[in-house]
């Protein structure tokens, strides 16, 4: 064994570090990962969302001078619940790990900070590699920015643990030497941050900036970094709606000391920025793997052909390649928000050209409903081939030219109700063939001018929808025959040319949907029987054209009040005279 693995100074140090790691965490009962202990640094777990870096640093100040507290966050800046505390001078990490620290009434989980070692190819048998494919065609919009390739590359992960195969198969070249030196510089540049950077080549004169707040814009960030050199460009990464993802890149015109910038502490708008070198991930060349037969996914089905309309797409997207036979057109569940053609409803039901949830105002059509997402002119779930328009899907699914939830006042038609959302001229679920218009969505939820559920044959208009969602001029549930107008909705929620929930006072019609929500000029819940007209909403609660909270009396009522007031005043005067 020793002949196969001759000891080197590095291996001896690593073994001693692993031994120290095991003993340091003995009190915690952990089995630590293989790797090298980061000196004078403590892993801290169980960090509550209320804790900030300043408080944690003051808590650990009893053990020595704290150099930095690093709370690990996700891309949006939300804490992942753990972090690292590094000290300026040498400290007894084993003693700190063995102590019991409670903070905000919560016990912190302590351990040594371990930098995992990468397993070199010569330590393992050569194994076939699984290459992650580039994003499928529906993700082409994330590549629309031609500058994106500077920062994003298809993810490549070897299976199971190694990222390179035998170094003998890859003789060193000047380029490989430069790349290795760049990686070394990357590791040292981020040492103060305690990061393990991805494999790749550093983009020169460019800094990664994380923890960007929504209030920060590119101009402010550029002026903040102007102290280090002439800023060429500030790029904040956003999603397709233009909302910041919380990170970006700052590039400089001239050569700058990226390592110095990364090591500095920059606070902006009261928030510490997370800095690091910009890494361009390396692509794994074909010569690094054994040739294997591949299963190539076919192009998207016809309804997805719109994603190929951009002639530049081939620059960034290639057919998906996965060495696994289980890859036929499968649309994942849940939806992918950054796809232009992601329409998933119910149980993995794909569609075409719709507005997702949440809605993106840059879409020509605003068609969104609830949780599962519906659209325009596609095969419903289940399909009704006899319908001229197929627009239904899953549980809550309506479409074309209607008012969503929440309401969008720019729609010419305001027809939306609560959770399930119906629309215009399509086959309902289930269908009512006796209706001239089939407009239903969800569980049996129809609207305009059709046979209601249940039907009221004595009503001039049949406009009711399942559990919630009614409209205009129909027989109520239960019916109030003495009312000239019947406007009620099952349990709650009326419709037709109305203002959605919450109400928008700018609407000429005030007909609200929600739980017990009023309609047009009426007395809300509970019912007021003295109303001239009974128009019910909510739990059958009368309304329409009634006396709002008591108003000032007029005419005879005013005279009677003055008479009563005079009587009381006269009695008071008599009592005062007797006294």
Curated annotation (Swiss-Prot):
Skewed-composition ranges (Low complexity): 11-27, 176-192
An annotated GO cellular component: nucleus
The RRM domain, residue ranges: 40-115, 205-280
Molecular function terms, GO-annotated: mRNA 3'-UTR binding; translation activator activity
The entry's keywords: Cytoplasm, Developmental protein, Differentiation, Nucleus, Repeat, RNA-binding, Spermatogenesis
Residue span(s) of domain DAZ: 332-355, 356-379, 380-403, 404-427, 428-451, 452-475, 476-499, 500-523, 524-547
InterPro entries for the chain: DAZ_dom (IPR043628), DAZ_RRM_vert (IPR037551), Nucleotide-bd_a/b_plait_sf (IPR012677), RBD_domain_sf (IPR035979), RRM_dom (IPR000504)
Feature: compositional bias, Polar residues: 1-10, 163-175
Organism domain of life: Eukaryota
SUPFAM superfamilies in the cross-refs: RNA-binding domain, RBD
A single BP term in Gene Ontology: cell differentiation
Tissue expression notes: Testis-specific. Expression restricted to premeiotic germ cells, particularly in spermatogonia (at protein level).
Major localisation: cytoplasm
Segments for region (Disordered): 1-27, 163-192
Function: RNA-binding protein that plays an essential role in spermatogenesis. May act by binding to the 3'-UTR of mRNAs and regulating their translation.
Illness: Spermatogenic failure Y-linked 2: A disorder resulting in the absence (azoospermia) or reduction (oligozoospermia) of sperm in the semen, leading to male infertility.
The family this protein is said to belong to: Belongs to the RRM DAZ family.
Note: DAZ genes are prone to deletions but also to duplications. In a population of infertile men, DAZ genes deletions are associated with oligozoospermia but an increased number of DAZ genes is not a significant risk factor for spermatogenic failure.
Domain notes: The DAZ domains are essential and mediate the interaction with DAZAP1 and DAZAP2.
Binding partners and assembly: Forms a heterodimer with BOLL and DAZL. Interacts with PUM2, DAZAP1, DAZAP2, DZIP1 and DZIP3.
Protein name according to UniProt: Deleted in azoospermia protein 4
């Amino acid at each position: 064994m020793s002949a196969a693995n001759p000891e080197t100074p590095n291996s001896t140090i690593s073994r001693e570090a692993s031994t120290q790691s095991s003993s340091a965490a003995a009190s915690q009962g952990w089995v630590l990962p293989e790797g090298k202990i980061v000196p004078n640094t403590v892993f801290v777990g169980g960090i509550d969302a209320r804790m900030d870096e300043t408080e944690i640093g003051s808590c650990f100040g009893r053990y020595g001078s704290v150099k930095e507290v690093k709370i690990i966050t996700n891309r949006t800046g939300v804490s992942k619940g753990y972090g690292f505390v590094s000290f300026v001078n040498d400290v007894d990490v084993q003693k700190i790990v063995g102590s019991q620290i409670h903070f905000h009434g919560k016990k912190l989980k302590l351990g040594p900070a371990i930098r995992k070692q990468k397993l070199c190819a010569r330590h393992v048998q050569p194994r076939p590699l699984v290459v992650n494919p580039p994003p499928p065609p529906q993700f082409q919009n994330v590549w629309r920015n031609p500058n994106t390739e500077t920062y994003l590359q298809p993810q490549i992960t070897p299976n199971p643990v190694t990222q390179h195969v035998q170094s003998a198969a890859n003789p060193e070249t000047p380029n490989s030497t430069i790349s290795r030196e760049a990686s070394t510089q990357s590791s040292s540049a981020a040492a103060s941050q305690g990061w393990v950077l991805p494999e790749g080549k550093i983009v020169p004169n460019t800094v990664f900036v994380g923890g960007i707040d929504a209030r920060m814009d590119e101009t402010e960030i550029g002026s903040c970094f102007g102290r280090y050199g002439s800023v060429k460009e500030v790029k904040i990464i956003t999603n397709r709606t233009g909302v910041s993802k919380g990170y970006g890149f700052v590039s400089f015109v001239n050569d700058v000391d990226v390592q110095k910038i990364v090591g500095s502490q920059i606070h902006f708008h009261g928030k510490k920025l997370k800095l690091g070198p910009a890494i361009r991930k390396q692509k794994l060349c074909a010569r690094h793997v054994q040739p294997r037969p591949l299963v190539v996914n076919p192009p998207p089905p016809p309804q997805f052909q719109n994603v190929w309309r951009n002639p530049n797409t081939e620059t960034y997207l290639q057919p998906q390649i996965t060495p696994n036979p289980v890859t036929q057109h499968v649309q994942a569940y849940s939806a992918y928000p950054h796809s232009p053609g992601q329409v998933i409803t119910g149980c993995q039901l794909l569609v075409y050209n719709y507005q997702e949830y949440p809605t993106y105002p840059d879409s020509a059509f605003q068609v969104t409903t609830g949780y599962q997402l519906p659209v325009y002119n596609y095969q419903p779930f289940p399909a009704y081939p006899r319908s001229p328009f197929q627009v239904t899907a899953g549980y809550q699914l309506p479409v074309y030219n209607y008012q969503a939830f929440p309401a969008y006042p720019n729609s010419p038609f305001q027809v939306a109700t609560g959770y399930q959302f119906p629309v215009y001229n399509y086959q309902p679920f289930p269908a009512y063939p006796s209706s001239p218009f089939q407009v239903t969505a969800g569980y049996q939820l129809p609207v305009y001018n059709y046979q209601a559920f249940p039907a009221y044959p004595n009503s001039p208009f049949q406009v009711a929808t399942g559990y919630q969602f009614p409209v205009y001029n129909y027989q109520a549930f239960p019916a109030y025959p003495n009312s000239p107008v019947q406007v009620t909705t099952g349990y709650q929620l009326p419709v037709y040319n109305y203002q959605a929930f919450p109400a928008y006072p700018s609407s000429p019609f005030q007909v609200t949907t929600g739980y017990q929500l009023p309609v047009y000029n009426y007395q809300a819940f509970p019912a007021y029987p003295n109303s001239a007209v009974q128009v019910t909403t909510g739990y059958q609660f009368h309304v329409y054209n009634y006396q709002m909270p008591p108003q000032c009396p007029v005419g005879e009522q005013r005279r009677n009040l003055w008479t009563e007031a005079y009587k009381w005043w006269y009695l008071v005067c008599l009592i005062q005279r007797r006294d």
